[in-house]
Design a protein with these regions (language model features):
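PRPP-associated nucleotide enzymes
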Residues: 1-164
Length: 164
């Protein structure tokens, strides 16, 4: 595990939960940055390095461990990994629902934040106007999301259902 890539974590927002999930991801990003700063401060003191030298060294180790050929410039500051997994929710004219993963989830621990009793009008693909969804509709979106995540190779799936 690297100090700049500490966990393989992904967060999915259910339909209508984008605002709440955005707040959670913002908090997680702050925790990642705080953790990196604490670890990097301890390592720079212990090894007599500057923070820039440490970031360069850790990036080198990550590049050596990676199977991909590194491209682009060397990072000058720590950037928190993007934890949000984008999903496109679609509702068809016959009432069927579909969840389509936009971002890859292979090997990630995925957290799905979903509110099955949300009674606010929700805009999803396939609908012209925002529509109030029933609990059954929300459950079907949840089931199709879990199914898509498992088929895409996620390491684990955890449901966060704030209502119940």
């Amino acid at each position: 595990m690297s100090i700049i890539k500490p966990h393989k974590l992904g967060v999915i927002a259910g339909p209508g939960r984008e605002y709440f999930t955005g707040k959670e991801v913002k908090h997680l990003r702050r925790l990642y940055i705080d953790r990196y700063e604490k670890v990097s401060d301890a390592l720079t003191r212990r090894h007599g390095m500057t923070s820039e030298e440490l970031l360069k060294f850790v990036t080198l180790v990550d590049d050596l461990d990676s199977r991909k050929i590194p491209v682009g410039k060397l990072p000058s500051t720590f950037h928190c990994p993007d934890l949000t997994i984008n999903v496109k929710y679609t509702r068809f004219a016959n009432g069927e629902e579909k969840a389509e993963l936009i971002d890859p989830v292979r090997g990630l621990s995925v957290y799905i934040i979903h509110d099955v009793s949300n009674s606010a009008p929700i805009k999803v693909a396939g609908l012209d106007e925002p529509q109030v969804m029933s609990v059954n509709d929300h459950l079907m979106f949840l089931f199709t999301t879990v199914h898509a995540v498992k088929l895409a190779g996620a390491e684990s799936v955890t449901l966060v259902l704030p209502t119940y």
